[in-house]
Amino acid sequence: KIFLAGTIDNGDSEDWQTKICKLIEECTTNSKPIAVYNPRRDDWPEDDQTKLIEEQIKWELEHMEKADLILMNICGDSKSPITLLELGIHSKENKLIVFCPDNFYRFDNVKVTCERYGVPLISTKKIEDFVKDKILAE
């Protein structure tokens, strides 16, 4: 089970999660299914979001705990405050891999945190390439 944590920016950022879901779907077989938890929602309302926000937060926390692997993708042009919070929550677990370009405004925070807790940090490879080379190749 893989959780796709990272930049969403209220739906304004690149939809990298759907790309990863499609890539995994195209490359997996019925004999080796992979469950993917994608927190991005297409049905987010424009008006009152109060109830849905709480529901979404609880869903994400629950599914990050259930996941065997958390792929965290931080886009360089984003602030990603929730992603930074999630990095702090899950950095001591042995199931997190972080993708973050070195032009991210808080790259040093991400780098030092990952180093301290032994979290793999990939700043030179796109998440799509990693998924193809490391996850789907196994």
What are the language-model segments listed below?
Residues 1-138:
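Conserved catalytic or regulatory cores that recognize and/or transform ribose-phosphate-containing ligands
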